[in-house]
Design a protein with these regions (language model features):
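Amphipathic alpha-helical segments enriched in hydrophobic/aromatic residues interleaved with Lys/Arg
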Residues: 102-164, 177
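N-terminal regulatory/effector-sensing and dimerization cores
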Residues: 2-108, 134-137
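Short amphipathic alpha-helical/adjacent loop interface patches that line ligand
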Residues: 92, 145, 172
């Protein structure tokens, strides 16, 4: 019965080169994962317990959600409440281009808060989402996007720098690069371990601690992101799934 209530809608806007999506009636728990893009969203209904970068809190209607690329997170329903959620996904290069239009400087911002409780900025997210769904004029959509980003840059972001996040161990970083380059292969723990001086157990613990997700979850996230990219290029879903 609950599954029949679930709805997921995804809309890619070619003018803005970003993705808008809505989740409604969702009761499932989302496992630990990350996105390659910026995520700007808000909770419309329901209550969730959110874990993000070793911190946790409850989020509910009116709360703004901000994820930087690769901010690992997961969430679960509270008291079985159904989640209603809207968001936009912005690729880093598109974010950088938009930020330059707003500030005159080219940089990729870093959101300093993942959750802003009872934020008025949720109205700006909703306005952008609605403009995309209505197929509004390019001017209206651009205004909505820039107005939203300007608010976020002023209140909840700082220029991204290498010091903002800790860098993984070089061996762990090389594993990430290898998995990104061989995402379609049937990789094994033996294969990954052979590339390091670690034992299997230590590799799993170290990778998960430094990256925020396990090697398997990291690989699955890369595959999903690749499949989504293929779909945006117009590749048929069956072919996109096979390529990922």
């Amino acid at each position: 019965m609950i599954q029949n209530q679930e709805q997921r809608h995804v809309h890619y806007d070619r003018d803005l080169e970003l993705e808008a999506y809505q989740l409604s009636g969702i009761v499932q728990k989302f496992p630990n994962h990350f996105h390659e893009c910026y995520v700007i969203g808000f909770v419309e209904g329901g209550k969730r317990h959110l874990w993000c970068k070793n911190q946790e809190c409850d989020v509910s209607a009116g709360d703004l959600i901000l994820f930087n690329p690769r901010d690992n997170h997961c969430c679960a329903p509270v008291d079985g409440q159904l989640l209603d959620y809207r968001a936009v996904n912005i690729q880093p290069e598109i974010m950088e281009k938009s930020v330059k239009e707003i500030t005159g400087r080219s940089f990729r911002p870093y959101f300093t808060q993942n959750v802003v409780f009872r934020s008025d900025i949720t109205r700006s997210v909703a306005a952008l989402y609605d403009a995309i769904l209505r197929h509004a004029s390019k001017l209206e959509k651009e205004e909505s996007l820039f107005f939203l980003l300007e608010q976020l840059l002023q209140e909840y972001a700082e220029p991204f720098s290498e010091e903002t996040i800790s860098r993984p161990n070089p061996q762990i970083q090389s594993l990430c690069t290898y998995m990104e380059e061989h995402f379609s292969d049937n990789l094994s723990l033996d294969e990954l371990t052979a590339m390091t001086t670690f034992g299997k157990s230590y590799l799993l613990r170290s990778f998960t601690k430094q990256i925020g997700v396990s090697p398997y979850r990291y690989l699955q996230t890369i595959r999903l992101d690749k499949a989504k990219h293929f779909l945006e290029q117009g590749i048929a879903p069956v072919d996109a799934a096979a390529m990922a």
